[in-house]
């Protein structure tokens, strides 16, 4: 799969950069107003009662700030954040080691929690519900179960695929919050804030131009800002102006809707070779040289969100909006 500027996934290097850009409290966090307002109430109530915050599940598309919110929850509660991920916990013993190392009140953040193995989930149930850990010592007839008490803690789980969570795990979260895509105005505020952190001057039209092409996702907005900053430093006087931002984004092949060259290849392939569809996923895969699951999981969600493709029983079709975007005449069916 080609590297994409508009991908909502983060690589390891980018995760380090994101950490330096993260707001430290709810007041600094831009967007997600309903989620913030509710978390403010839950956090304040827990602090007033001198209790740990109830377990929190954050779900929604990647790149919207789930990890940042987990860090903010820990900061607001005045406790430490311990971070891991579903794929990193391979055995029940791995989870037991993490849980027994927690201090009272700590926040344990598990990213991609939907990827936990079922046997590991079963260890997590009593830990979440009763703050205890059941460990089996020995094997065969002589095996016995020992219960270890754990300090009270808050589990913050994050997932992009909440439907893959088992019902027993999902039901143990007292707070469930869905993160939504951001508005252009919110993304422009994020771009402006990030530019301040980078000590780069940017005007409002430029921030809006970057926001418009960021697919509703802060991670994409910050990535595009970093690349536009490169153009401003090399081709200009380090200030990000509207001309610089438009020129940079055109050279980066990110159009005004946030579509990149791969999106264009997919959509134009459907139009030119299949008259706009319907066409099956495997056929699209063979046509553009990408895996079917990559198309379905990576490329399609945004195209579906903006109404550029539709899924039908007979396959995918492009909508009239695609022809309008590419300034083409839509076919007429008599």
From Swiss-Prot:
It is an enzyme of class 3 (hydrolase). Mg(2+) binds at residue 67. GO terms for cellular component: cytoplasm; Holliday junction resolvase complex. It is found in: Cytoplasm. It catalyses: ATP + H2O = ADP + phosphate + H(+). Its EC number is 3.6.4.-. Keywords: ATP-binding, Cytoplasm, DNA damage, DNA recombination, DNA repair, DNA-binding, Hydrolase, Nucleotide-binding. ATP binds at residues 21-22, 63, 66-68, 129-131, 172, 182, 219. Disruption phenotype: RecD2 is synthetically lethal with ruvAB. The keyword 4Fe-4S does not apply. SUPFAM superfamilies: P-loop containing nucleoside triphosphate hydrolases, Winged helix' DNA-binding domain. One of its GO terms (biological process) is DNA recombination. Residues 256-334 are annotated as: Head domain (RuvB-H). Residues 1-182 are annotated as: Large ATPase domain (RuvB-L). One of its GO terms (molecular function) is four-way junction DNA binding. DNA binds at residues 311, 316. Residues 183-253 are annotated as: Small ATPAse domain (RuvB-S). The keyword Iron does not apply. NCBIfam families: PRK00080.1, ruvB. Belongs to the RuvB family. Homohexamer. Forms an RuvA(8)-RuvB(12)-Holliday junction (HJ) complex. HJ DNA is sandwiched between 2 RuvA tetramers; dsDNA enters through RuvA and exits via RuvB. An RuvB hexamer assembles on each DNA strand where it exits the tetramer. Each RuvB hexamer is contacted by two RuvA subunits (via domain III) on 2 adjacent RuvB subunits; this complex drives branch migration. In the full resolvosome a probable DNA-RuvA(4)-RuvB(12)-RuvC(2) complex forms which resolves the HJ. Homohexamer which interacts with RecU. Has 3 domains, the large (RuvB-L) and small ATPase (RuvB-S) domains and the C-terminal head (RuvB-H) domain. The head domain binds DNA, while the ATPase domains jointly bind ATP, ADP or are empty depending on the state of the subunit in the translocation cycle. During a single DNA translocation step the structure of each domain remains the same, but their relative positions change. The RuvA-RuvB-RuvC complex processes Holliday junction (HJ) DNA during genetic recombination and DNA repair, while the RuvA-RuvB complex plays an important role in the rescue of blocked DNA replication forks via replication fork reversal (RFR). RuvA specifically binds to HJ cruciform DNA, conferring on it an open structure. The RuvB hexamer acts as an ATP-dependent pump, pulling dsDNA into and through the RuvAB complex. RuvB forms 2 homohexamers on either side of HJ DNA bound by 1 or 2 RuvA tetramers; 4 subunits per hexamer contact DNA at a time. This is Holliday junction branch migration complex subunit RuvB. The gene is ruvB.
């Amino acid at each position: 799969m080609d590297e994409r500027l508009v991908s909502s996934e983060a690589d390891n290097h980018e995760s380090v950069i994101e950490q330096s850009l993260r707001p430290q409290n709810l007041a600094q966090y831009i967007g997600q107003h309903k989620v913030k307002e509710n978390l403010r109430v839950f956090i304040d109530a827990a602090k007033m009662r001198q209790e740990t915050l109830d377990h929190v599940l954050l779900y929604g598309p990647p790149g919207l700030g789930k990890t940042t919110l987990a860090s903010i929850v820990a900061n607001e509660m005045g406790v430490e954040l311990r971070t891991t991920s579903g794929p990193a916990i391979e055995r029940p013993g791995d989870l037991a080691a993490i849980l027994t190392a927690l201090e009272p009140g700590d926040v344990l953040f598990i990213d991609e929690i939907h990827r936990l193995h079922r046997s590991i989930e079963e260890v997590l149930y009593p830990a979440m519900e009763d703050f205890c850990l059941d460990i089996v010592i020995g094997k065969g007839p002589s095996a016995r179960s020992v219960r270890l008490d754990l300090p009270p803690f808050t589990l913050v789980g994050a997932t992009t695929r909440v439907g893959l969570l088992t019902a027993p795990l999902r039901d143990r979260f007292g707070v469930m919050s869905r993160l939504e895509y951001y508005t252009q105005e919110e993304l422009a505020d994020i771009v402006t804030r990030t530019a301040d952190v980078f000590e780069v001057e940017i005007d409002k039209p430029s921030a809006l131009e970057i926001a418009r092409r960021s697919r509703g996702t802060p991670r994409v907005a910050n990535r595009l800002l970093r690349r536009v900053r490169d153009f401003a430093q090399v081709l200009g006087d380090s200030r990000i102006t509207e001309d610089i931002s438009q020129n940079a984004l055109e050279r980066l092949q990110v159009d005004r809707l946030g579509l990149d060259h791969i999106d264009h290849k997919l959509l134009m392939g459907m139009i030119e070779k299949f008259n706009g569809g319907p066409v099956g996923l495997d056929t699209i895969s063979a046509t553009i040289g990408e895996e079917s699951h990559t198309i379905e999981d990576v490329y399609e969600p945004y195209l579906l969100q903006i109404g550029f493709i539709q899924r039908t029983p007979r396959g995918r079709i492009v909508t009239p909006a695609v022809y309008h975007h590419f300034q083409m005449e839509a076919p007429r069916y008599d």
